Amino acid sequence: MELNRRDFMKANAAVAAAAAAGITIPVKNVHAADDDMGIRWDKAPCRYCGTGCSVLVGTKDGRVVATQGDPDAEVNRGLNCIKGYFLSKIMYGADRVQTPLLRMKDGKFHKEGDFTPVSWDQAFTVMADKIKAILKEKKDPNAIGMFSSGQTTIFEGYAKVKLWKAGLRSNTIDPNARHCMASAAVAFLRTFGMDEPMGCYNDIEKTDAFVLWGSNMAEMHPILWSRISDRRLSSDKVKVVVMSTFEHRSFELADTPIIFKPHSDLAILNYIANYIIQNDKVNWDFVNKHTKFKRGETDIGYGLRPEHPLEVAAKNRKTAGKMYDSDFEEFKKIVAPYTLEEAHRISGVPKDQLETLAKMYADPQQNLVSFWTMGFNQHTRGVWVNHMVYNVHLLTGKISKPGCGPFSLTGQPSACGTAREVGTFVHRLPADMVVTNPKHVEIAENIWKLPKGTISNKPGFPAVQQSRALKDGKLNFLWQLCTNNMQGGPNINEEIFPGWRNPDNLIVVSDPYPSASAVAADLILPTCMWVEKEGAYGNAERRTQFWRQQVKGPGQSRSDLWQIVEFSKYFKTEEVWSEELLAQMPEYRGKTLYEVLYLNGEVNKFQTPTNVPGYINDEAEDFGFYLQKGLFEEYASFGRGHGHDLADFDTYHQVRGLRWPVVDGKETLWRYREGYDPYVKAGEEVSFYGYPDKKAIILGVPYEAPAESPDEEYDLWLCTGRVLEHWHTGTMTRRVPELHKAFPNNLCWMHPTDAKKRGLRHGDKVKLITRRGEMISHLDTRGRNKCPEGLIYTTFFDAGQLANKLTLDATDPISGETDYKKCAVKVVKA
């Protein structure tokens, strides 16, 4: 009997499931074991990173019993990383929260009370009463906040935006993508007039060179790394450059391994631009037709509190994002100081390596893709450094074509689809629209059938400012969903924890587990995970993927979508809207926000799905209509017709995702390029149609120093990040026994010479100390991460070692994104 690849992959998963159940399967029956065992298989995107791998989910008796790589998925082609192979276990930790828990004392809510089980109605009543009291007292909707995630589904993100920005009229809603992707998003919008990459993963098989900037793809995007490895090892002409402030596993494949001093990537990129100009490698035909030059503001500060000395000294803090009209000659002058010698002096990179790198970008015969993640984005000049990599691709014309382009990789499964495309940032609306643009607001109010003026044009508090506003009493209600900011946010000691425990504030956390955030909150709402609900994600290559609900959540767990929509029933329009607004649409008087936002004739127009026997949809059962479909089709109307086109809802359930814009059923692989993008007209060749003149911006900005550097007392650089086995704060992965055993606790990686100078040895218990806090860990001088002298590396997955007690809450002044990669630290024996 023949066994094809798909059956082989399914058989592997069946064997794994059988082993977990303690049974054996006859070899002759292994290919059909899933049917014999009663396991049902269905597709879903992986719950972890932004790669967007598809997995097949095996369910039996109401539980997920196995997962496997999806052989029909173009992204991962049947492969999973180590985290993906154990997806079936993330929902079954022994400590799942299964009922709402409210801090209570003497039978009522008390900030210092003990967590006590309550009903959903009690929980929502406490929340609604607090919000109504704030609105009545402060008359400022931005005093009520939501902090969410690039892990919530597209449907959930859209429902949140409607409730917060339209219903409660607050723009204080921000995702944790502010911590990881804001600089990339801002630079995309500023450069091209539209967000998200122009290329796709197909570039990997078509390029001649890969340059990784601050990205350990071997551990953080391992399936993409497997494709890069295959491409590199299949051709001697293909080269890999890996750039980082320390050596990690991606260096094993590097032809040119480059270690640079923290923050000096700015100088290196300006050197490359200068090299291209000085060696007459500018693609003038491309530059003249498709680009324009601007000059950025300088001396813009570091996103710290206004009274901080660095902010007081910054001359242009209030105009940080301004760009001035310029020309090539001025740009040439801006990059001219960044000679080979100067770039070497600032970065510490050997001159021959810098020159090799510059020649690769300059060579018109060599296709090249730049990949980057947090090393670029978590940067007090993250917007600038994103601009700079676009600069070198635009100067050479290596962009928007197969095998050539700048590619920002996302770290969360729907940082693109939910946070960016839906617009769950304080300043955004769906499809790249913003609250500060009256035309965009008018479009949103028309689609949502709202009175004119409902949506505020004042952005709310973004992520780091939310923490400060809670501490200062300017923000008095925060609902956190699907993230763990008490562990993942910066400067926990000084900024986050004080605001959460401020007696005037109510903090609500929706979480499936008692995370650091949950136990610090006032109210915990039990949340369904992954395939316990129907969902959709959007990955790093603009691919939108759907999945069906496979199993039910435990106890009283409810999806974030159910929580948001059900909560809207607790407000009547008179309680949250002004008389002026109600006078425009008197038919809304006496109605709940649920009726106005979700029973509006659009969201509720699709009936409960009946063509998928055997599947459940808890939201459809509770609300009486196909909520996910209604939300998606209304959301999609924002983008159709102007470059953000999505396919119809039902199509996504039939395919392994489509890359937008999707026009006439066809996805787009390379945006802005004639022959691939339906929005580029015949004869245009390239059209950056995000701007009316269809030209991208080349921005001239300099190198500027970091916010904090080592000194005599705090004499080392601290860089924080992740490891392969765990994801973010470990809320899921630390509850998977195999992953926990593989890497049980955080470590501090240090160069052996630095350890010897401090009288330390491998394995020693050490204390890391910064100006903000301290942490106990164990020293590693021999492991996978090899730090240069003067720098240490640690991770933030371990709730027993809160690395973000150490980090500085400096941000990029333009994007508001946190710099987790650079602050000063000292290390002593504990």
From Swiss-Prot:
UniProt similarity note: Belongs to the prokaryotic molybdopterin-containing oxidoreductase family. NasA/NapA/NarB subfamily.
CC terms in the record's Gene Ontology section: membrane; nitrate reductase complex; periplasmic space
Subcellular location(s) per record: Periplasm
Function: Catalytic subunit of the periplasmic nitrate reductase complex NapAB. Receives electrons from NapB and catalyzes the reduction of nitrate to nitrite.
Subunit description: Component of the periplasmic nitrate reductase NapAB complex composed of NapA and NapB.
Cofactor(s) the protein needs: [4Fe-4S] cluster; Mo-bis(molybdopterin guanine dinucleotide)
UniProt feature coiled coil, ranges: none
Name listed for the protein in its UniProt record: Periplasmic nitrate reductase
Signal peptide annotation: 1-32
Biological process per Gene Ontology, one example term: cellular respiration
Enzyme Commission number(s) from the entry: 1.9.6.1
Pfam family, one: Molybdopterin
Lineage start: Bacteria, Pseudomonadati, Pseudomonadota, Gammaproteobacteria, Pasteurellales
Binding annotation for [4Fe-4S] cluster: 46, 49, 53, 81
SUPFAM superfamilies: ADC-like, Formate dehydrogenase/DMSO reductase, domains 1-3
Major enzyme class: oxidoreductase
Entry keywords, A to Z: 4Fe-4S, Electron transport, Iron, Iron-sulfur, Metal-binding, Molybdenum, Nitrate assimilation, Oxidoreductase, Periplasm, Signal, Transport
Chain sites annotated for binding Mo-bis(molybdopterin guanine dinucleotide): 83, 151, 176, 180, 213-220, 244-248, 374, 378, 484, 510-511, 533, 560, 720-729, 804, 821
Bound cofactor: record note: Binds 1 [4Fe-4S] cluster.
Posttranslational modification: Predicted to be exported by the Tat system. The position of the signal peptide cleavage has not been experimentally proven.
Residue ranges constituting the 4Fe-4S Mo/W bis-MGD-type domain according to the UniProt record: 39-95
Binding site for substrate: 796
The encoding gene: napA
Catalytic activity annotation: 2 Fe(II)-[cytochrome] + nitrate + 2 H(+) = 2 Fe(III)-[cytochrome] + nitrite + H2O
Origin species: Mannheimia succiniciproducens (strain KCTC 0769BP / MBEL55E)
Alphabetized GO MF terms: 4 iron, 4 sulfur cluster binding; electron transfer activity; iron ion binding; molybdenum ion binding; molybdopterin cofactor binding; nitrate reductase (cytochrome) activity
